[in-house]
């Protein structure tokens, strides 16, 4: 297995620059692993594939207003901060743009819209992959000073920032949306609940690894970034109950899938128990899924870790066939793009 195996060519015009309205009007490509069939549907029709007692697991992490504009105190040059995650000791890991010449000790003034300096950020240290360690003078209003960051391949501003949040987003912490969940509407979730589907939530705060291509020739040499996750006792209980009664677990997105699989591997008393902590499970082809029976996801970037996880679930030959069909039939790709359901 080589990283180049997970490459494919995508015309730029297939990268969705804005979301469709309503959310559940996006297209849905259904992959049936048992029959080998590929079926075109609309996302709002996904209810056809659920049965009473099935469990739907969604990631309720909310995207932080993590893109913050500032001015370097020593040169008065403009600089942009992209918050990644807290380090657990009162500081933040972040990317700076431009960042190469921004050394430890640099002070960044962060202004409110009125032009008054609100807080300052100090660069404390350089870390791997261009990441900087920052400490803010005051975090009380930090989240009010930033904007929700969009993926680097989206060049069109979004009229409503809430369109880059799921309708059930609850807990601030991600720098990228759990995009498979963007297709759900409150009405669709209500229909599923009325059908007897158990809707449950986990929290996994998504980092930049979701966008970064794997650079190592052998993907097994890639070190996936850690992300913080929480899986409640109630969600674990719902999953165990479904498995014990022959029902299925549908995971929405690679983030929810990674967290439930990691929690299952760490559980010593049953299939899965509650969990809170860092998630760093790197799922590659050959992995045996313990929790996820069905999988809802978007179309992913070449050589990316989400694509590798999806390949592990569907099988890369079948998934490649699905991607070829999606490209030939003009599906929309990436964060604001269409979805697939893998049965």
Curated annotation (Swiss-Prot):
InterPro entries: QueA (IPR003699), QueA_dom1 (IPR042118), QueA_dom2 (IPR042119), QueA_sf (IPR036100)
Disulfide bonds: none
This protein's encoding gene: queA
Main localization category: cytoplasm
Name of this chain's protein: S-adenosylmethionine:tRNA ribosyltransferase-isomerase
The UniProt record lists the keyword Signal: no
Any Pfam family matching the protein: Queuosine_synth
Quaternary organization: Monomer.
GO MF terms held by the record: S-adenosylmethionine:tRNA ribosyltransferase-isomerase activity
First-level EC class: transferase
Biological function: Transfers and isomerizes the ribose moiety from AdoMet to the 7-aminomethyl group of 7-deazaguanine (preQ1-tRNA) to give epoxyqueuosine (oQ-tRNA).
EC number: 2.4.99.17
Catalytic activity, as annotated: 7-aminomethyl-7-carbaguanosine(34) in tRNA + S-adenosyl-L-methionine = epoxyqueuosine(34) in tRNA + adenine + L-methionine + 2 H(+)
An example Gene Ontology CC term for this record: cytoplasm
Family listed: Belongs to the QueA family.
Keyword tags: Cytoplasm, Queuosine biosynthesis, S-adenosyl-L-methionine, Transferase
Keyword S-adenosyl-L-methionine: yes
Compartment(s) of residence: Cytoplasm
């Amino acid at each position: 297995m080589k990283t180049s195996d997970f490459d494919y060519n995508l015309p730029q015009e297939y990268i969705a620059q804005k979301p469709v309205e309503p959310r559940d009007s996006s297209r849905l490509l259904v992959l049936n692993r048992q029959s080998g069939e590929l079926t075109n549907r609309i996302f709002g029709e996904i209810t056809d594939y659920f049965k009473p007692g099935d469990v739907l697991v969604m990631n309720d992490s909310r995207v932080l207003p993590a893109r913050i504009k500032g001015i370097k105190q020593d040169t008065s040059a403009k600089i942009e901060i992209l918050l990644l995650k807290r380090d657990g000791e009162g500081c933040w890991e972040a990317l700076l743009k431009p960042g190469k010449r921004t050394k430890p000790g640099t002070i960044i003034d962060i202004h409110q819209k009125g032009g008054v300096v609100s807080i300052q950020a100090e660069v404390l240290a350089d870390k791997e992959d261009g990441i900087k360690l920052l400490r803010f003078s005051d975090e009380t209003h930090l989240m009010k000073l930033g904007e929700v960051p969009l993926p680097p391949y989206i060049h069109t501003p979004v009229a409503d920032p809430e369109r880059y949040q799921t309708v059930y987003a609850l807990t601030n912490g991600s720098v990228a949306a759990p995009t498979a969940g963007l297709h759900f509407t409150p009405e669709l979730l209500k229909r599923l609940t009325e059908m007897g589907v158990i809707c449950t939530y986990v929290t996994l705060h998504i980092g930049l690894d979701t966008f970064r291509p794997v650079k190592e020739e052998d993907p097994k040499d890639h070190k996936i970034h850690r992300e913080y996750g929480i899986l409640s006792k109630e969600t674990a209980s719902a999953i165990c109950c479904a498995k014990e009664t022959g029902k299925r677990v549908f995971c929405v997105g690679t983030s929810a899938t990674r967290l439930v699989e990691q929690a299952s591997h760490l559980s010593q008393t049953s299939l899965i128990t509650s969990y809170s902590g860092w998630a760093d499970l790197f799922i590659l082809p050959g992995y045996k899924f313990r929790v996820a029976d069905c999988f809802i996801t978007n179309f992913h970037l070449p050589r990316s870790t989400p694509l590798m996880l999806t390949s592990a679930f569907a099988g890369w030959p079948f998934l490649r066939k699905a991607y070829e069909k999606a490209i030939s039939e003009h599906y929309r790709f990436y964060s604001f793009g269409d979805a697939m359901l893998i049965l």
